[in-house]
């Protein structure tokens, strides 16, 4: 049997880290066994859908390198890949179940259902539908339908049955039918409920494996019951439920926690290296046997084993994510780095407006987390209005290094040449003349030329500051030192 997995987002917002992980694990599982990965859109919750939500999901998955074999953008034989195009189909199947006595019309009002729920909660019981409409006679049903009385369709749960499955991550899970309620499968607006549409789609798209969050464990027995009612072979789909992702406090990652960036778009916007995010997300609950951390997508596919997915909560460590991004920026080629800067919305205008901008950026390539930080570093280092710190002036005075600054200035002023190699030569001359080396040579030159005690490669930094600015800084600091 060919492995076919799916990720089925609702277009209700941006791609969340949790959704990205679900998509990635389904993608890796399919690719590890030469199978297909499908993205379908579950857009039946019309009130919550947002404009552009579908493209947003697909675009940010593509940014992470997760490209589906089938989707609304590349449809194949198993479409439609969007639920709103299948509403009549779902409705027909729900009505078929009514004809087969496996489901029934429910005419209960919202007020009655709310009253039943309130009563159950007061009695400390789990709210369950009281089956008021289960045994309505044919005459009553026909009368209600003729009067256009609003109805839903509910599945009749077999209370004597045990709904169980061998979870790919958690082992055997079993839930008695007596613990379930008769679920609504078709709403009063004729739109299929989530659990009903999902079962039909998974069956008709020949999905073989479903990896999803643990919040879906409670949906699984209902989906098994629906599949049985539709005469689907429930052994054909394997389910695996991922652990939750927790924040630094140990609480489940919540979209309401605004202090933590949880959407892939946040990281794209800040200019993180895309695969750094993919790599980080891959290790949220997966431990490769060889304990590799830095992995290409190809390596992930080769190493992926569903048996290595953890039941324990996965810790969302932003510091670890930043570490991954720094590693990737350090290891990518100069050409890849330059192309990234030229194309990203944060930096492409800066590239056009300053011909030295790319060279300035290259100074920080091996140290940055993202492009947002890179811009700050470039601005800080090459800020024309920067003032020298009193503590840096004191450093030069205390260590009696004024001569280093003066000799560097004298060597620079007598030459019109100004490039990286020339600056390196001057530094060598200063070393010979003053007999200083190491920090006693480089620190006073850095402070005097850049007005900063730290920074990237010195000769390049001086070069990109420009001769005029460097001379101005040297004159100003010599006045202070004298």
Swiss-Prot record:
Family matches, as InterPro entries: aa-tRNA-synth_I_cd-bd (IPR045462), aa-tRNA-synth_I_codon-bd_sub2 (IPR020751), aa-tRNA-synth_I_CS (IPR001412), aa_tRNA-synth_I_cd-bd_sf (IPR008925), Glu-tRNA-ligase_bac/mito (IPR004527), Glu/Gln-tRNA-synth (IPR000924), Glu/Gln-tRNA-synth_Ib_cat-dom (IPR020058), GluQ/Sye (IPR049940)
GO biological-process terms attached to the record: glutamyl-tRNA aminoacylation
Motif ('KMSKS' region): 252-256
Record field: catalytic activity: tRNA(Glu) + L-glutamate + ATP = L-glutamyl-tRNA(Glu) + AMP + diphosphate
Motif 'HIGH' region, residue range(s) on this chain: 9-19
GO annotations of cellular component type: cytosol
Residues that bind ATP: 255
Oligomer status and interactors: Monomer.
Main function: Catalyzes the attachment of glutamate to tRNA(Glu) in a two-step reaction: glutamate is first activated by ATP to form Glu-AMP and then transferred to the acceptor end of tRNA(Glu).
Family from the record: Belongs to the class-I aminoacyl-tRNA synthetase family. Glutamate--tRNA ligase type 1 subfamily.
Record-linked NCBIfam families: gltX_bact
Protein name: Glutamate--tRNA ligase
Lineage: Bacteria, Bacillati, Mycoplasmatota, Mycoplasmoidales, Mycoplasmoidaceae
Designated gene of the protein: gltX
